[in-house]
From Swiss-Prot:
May associate with CadN and participate in the transmission of developmental information. Can associate with alpha-catenin. Accumulates through wg signaling; arm function in wg signal transduction is required early in development for determination of neuroblast fate. Arm and Abl proteins function cooperatively at adherens junctions in both the CNS and epidermis. This is Armadillo segment polarity protein. Interacts with Mer and Moe at the adherens junction. Disruption phenotype: Development of anterior structures in the posterior part of the segment. PROSITE patterns: ARM_REPEAT (PS50176). Residues 714-779 are annotated as: Disordered. It comes from Musca domestica (House fly).
Length: 813
């Protein structure tokens, strides 16, 4: 017979001769002891020869052409071929319908490679699947029919007065609810669900309660079941079970409520009305981590977007328990769900201090190095929301170090949160400022700003944090130098112009002012164009304020101040002039400022009703008047009159700067002019002394300065913890310096609202639109009282950037 007409059994590999097939099957079936006679364990021979070294010499394993030793005759081989053919139907039957074979019958296998199923085996797979589907369908139908017939009787038994009967019925229903068909039948019977709810509400029998609530738990995995439970009034009954001492009952109740809260409309309100929040907070004292994870997730669902729920959690002691969980466990899902609750509560002004007082900042900081990104993100969000209430908290050194490290993350949200937290925690806190500087925070923040590009959600808080670090603490000069050494000056100056928005520009102005305090930064800032950009911003903001002033004068109405992106243009005027004031200390910078034709604006600002603007204008004129050219331009612009008027200002800083400018302008004047000016300055000083309303009260200041300061200036200006109001001695309007509450995304926080007090002209604080979410730090020093004499043999020393009324740009604010 030719090779092409050779017969190949369908379940053997093709292209093998009949003799070779028989030999292979014979080896598989006969040459290996089955264990029936010898009792040895049945095993398939190794095809690689590695399992039995004695098989290495067997030529059959490697070369079928060599044949077998001459142990079998041709007749024996023919018999084996015949047996193989005769058992084919049995092999098919065994593969497709194994349950029809009699026990004890062995069918020889024809599988050569265990990794390659035979044709029969491949054909058997769909038939087995079909068989199982038919069996399942029959069972499903049987279950459904059984449940449908049994439900009416079971309802009667559940309503029986005998608790034993109720218990037995509840257990039967529980068993039925474990199968899909009967579970659907129970769900479709409102009477059955109502009977189960009555059973858990009225029964005192533990087994009845456990079986009934277990059934409701099984039903709650399906939307139809959730609706049935809700309509049957199951939520109050389930909430009642949250007081059960039995673990299984508690588990069934809380998981059923959890499913309802997740997927059933109206469940949240029903749980709140049933007192579920209080009971859930009590359950936080347990120690089963998986149980606690469900409870905390329920609390998060109930508290999200509902202020009343947040206050109930607070009144029940929730913050303390939640912080305890964050400190005590390492189960990731529990930590994640708990951090979600804390995140929701952290936007509540009442819960925020409670969480901080409970040690929430430290507890959340423990998990910033956790490998779970979702946990780290939630902790950072929560810390950001809490950070404005934690500016006075001690022991945050580990948190600050972690935040500096987190700034290197590639996750935008992580970096945004870390920068915002650092901005708030370094506000008005010298210890935190020093800590951040010592752990490389300045370098990290500069790199963050460079890498952020135009992502203002990162650059604004990072710039605010740098502004805090560059003023009012022992390492501030080091921080000012570090920004330059890390190539940050050019990047920061670029933030002063588009596409930056006004809140970022305002923050950058304050940072530039602080950086200019370092003499080594004066020239680089000039070379990078800082003066040009500041002057441009000043002119733009000044024009806007003048336009607004003209509009008010024309219409006679009280129009609100000029705003852009929530920033008052008066703040930009004040900040830019203040920064130019510091930059003008350097002679080359003064020359460049004179060339910008901006001195007329400085003179006009002397008439402004906002005292801080008057002060910074007088301050920059004081520096510019140090050069003869500058003094001449100032006089030509008509500054003598307003400066003379400002000598009588109750704001000591304004008066002193005005006196200094007038003195410098008088250097080339005749002796008679100098004498009249000396009398004017001396008279003004005496008037201040005569009008001293403090008497002999000791404020801890030099006697001359104490005599010249009013009460609001002494307390708010020198020792205030927040930005005070800027008031005018001429009865001008108060100027809002602090920041109102400004939520970020769905989260509230990041601000410190400051009391706005009246001084001098007094007045209630106006409502001002929020300008930035980041808290600001007061930068206030002391004026050298000994220099405040007006003997014209020596020019009066101007305030050394230590202003009675701190301006926003001159602060961490």
């Amino acid at each position: 017979m030719s090779h092409n007409n050779q017969y190949n059994p369908p379940d053997l590999p093709p292209m093998v001769s009949a003799k070779e097939q028989t030999l292979m099957w014979q080896q598989n079936s006969y040459l290996v002891d089955s264990g029936i006679h010898s009792g040895a364990v049945t095993q398939a021979p190794s095809l690689s020869g590695k399992e039995d070294e004695e098989m290495e010499g067997d030529p059959l394993m490697f070369d079928l052409d060599t044949g077998f030793p001459q142990n079998f005759t041709q007749d024996q081989v023919d018999d084996m071929n015949q047996q193989l053919s005769q058992t084919r139907s049995q092999r098919v039957r065994a593969a497709m319908f194994p349950e029809t074979l009699e026990e004890g019958i062995e069918i020889p296998s024809t599988q050569f490679d265990p990794q390659q199923p035979t044709a029969v085996q491949r054909l058997a797979e769909p038939s087995q699947m079909l068989k199982h589907a038919v069996v399942n369908l029959i069972n499903y139908q049987d279950d459904a029919e059984l449940a449908t017939r049994a439900i009416p009787e079971l309802i009667k038994l559940l309503n029986d007065e005998d608790q034993v009967v109720v218990s037995q019925a509840a257990m039967m229903v529980h068993q039925l609810s474990k199968k899909e068909a009967s579970r659907h039948a129970i769900t479709n019977s409102p009477q059955m669900v109502a009977a189960l709810v009555r059973a858990i509400s009225n029964s005192n029998d533990l087994e009845s309660t456990k079986a009934a609530v277990g059934t409701l738990h099984n039903l709650s995995h399906h939307r139809q079941g959730l609706l049935a439970i809700f309509k049957s009034g199951g939520i109050p009954a389930l909430v009642k079970l949250l007081s059960s001492p039995v673990e299984s009952v508690l588990f069934y109740a809380i998981t059923t409520l959890h499913n309802l809260l997740l997927h059933q409309d109206g469940s949240k309100m029903a749980v709140r009305l049933a007192g579920g929040l209080q009971k859930m907070v009590t359950l936080l004292q347990r120690n089963n981590v998986k149980f606690l994870a469900i409870v905390t997730d329920c609390l998060q669902i109930l508290a999200y977007g509902n202020q009343e729920s947040k206050l109930i959690i607070l009144a029940s002691g929730g913050p303390n328990e939640l912080v305890r969980i964050m400190r005590s466990y390492d189960y990731e899902k529990l930590l994640w769900t708990t951090s979600r609750v804390l995140k929701v509560l952290s936007v509540c002004s009442s819960n925020k201090p409670a969480i901080v007082d409970a040690g929430g900042m430290q507890a959340l900081a423990m998990h910033l190095s956790n490998p779970s990104p979702r946990l780290v993100q939630n902790c950072l969000w929560t810390l950001r929301n809490l950070s404005d209430a934690a500016t006075k908290v001690d022991g945050l050194e580990p948190l600050l170090q972690s935040l500096v490290q987190v700034l290197a993350s590639t996750d935008v949200n992580v970096v945004t949160c870390a920068a915002g937290i650092l901005s708030n925690l370094t506000c008005n806190n010298q210890r935190n400022k020093a800590t951040v500087c010592q752990v490389g925070g300045v370098d990290a923040l500069v790199r963050t700003i460079i890498n952020a590009g135009d992502r203002e959600e990162i650059t604004e808080p990072a710039v605010c944090a740098l502004r805090h670090l560059t003023t009012r603490h022992a390492d501030s000069e080091m921080a000012q130098n570090a920004v330059r050494l890390n190539y940050g000056l050019s990047v920061i100056v670029k933030l002063l112009h588009p596409p930056s928005r006004w809140p970022l520009i305002k923050a950058a102005i304050g940072l530039v002012r602080n950086l200019a305090l370092c003499p080594a930064n004066a020239a680089p800032l000039r070379e990078h164009g800082a003066i040009h950009h500041l002057v441009r911003l000043l002119m733009r903001a000044f024009q806007d304020t003048e336009r607004q002033r003209s509009s008010v004068a024309t219409t006679g109405s009280q129009q609100p101040a000029a705003y852009a992106d929530g920033v008052r243009m008066e703040e930009i005027v004040e900040g830019t002039v203040g920064a130019l004031h510091i930059l003008a200390r350097e002679s080359h910078n003064r020359a460049l400022i004179r060339q910008q034709s901006v001195i007329p604006i400085f003179v006009r600002l002397l008439f402004n009703e906002i005292e801080n603007i008057q002060r910074v204008a007088a301050g920059v004129l004081c520096e510019l008047a140090a050069d003869k050219e500058g003094a001449e331009i100032i006089e030509q612009e008509g500054a003598t009159g307003p400066l003379t008027d400002l000598l009588h200002s109750r704001n000591e800083g304004v008066a002193t700067y005005a006196a200094a400018v007038l003195f410098r302008m008088s250097e080339d004047k005749p002796q008679d002019y100098k004498k009249r000016l000396s009398i004017e300055l001396t008279t003004n000083s005496l008037l201040r002394e005569d009008n001293n309303i403090w008497g002999n009260a000791d404020l801890g200041l030099g006697p001359d300065l104490q005599d010249m300061l009013g009460p609001e200036q002494a307390y708010e200006g020198l020792y205030g913890q927040g930005p005070p109001s800027v008031h005018s001695s001429h009865g001008g309007r108060a100027f809002q310096q602090g920041y109102d509450t400004l939520p970020i995304d769905s989260m509230q926080g990041l601000e410190i609202s400051s009391p706005v007090g009246g001084g001098g002209g007094g007045g209630a604080p106006p409502s001002a639109a929020p300008t930035s979410p980041y808290s600001m730090d007061m930068d206030v020093g002391e004026i050298d009282a000994g220099a405040l004499n007006f003997d014209l043999d020596a020019m009066p020393t101007p305030p050394n950037d230590n202003n009675n009324l701190a301006a926003w740009y001159d602060t961490d604010c």
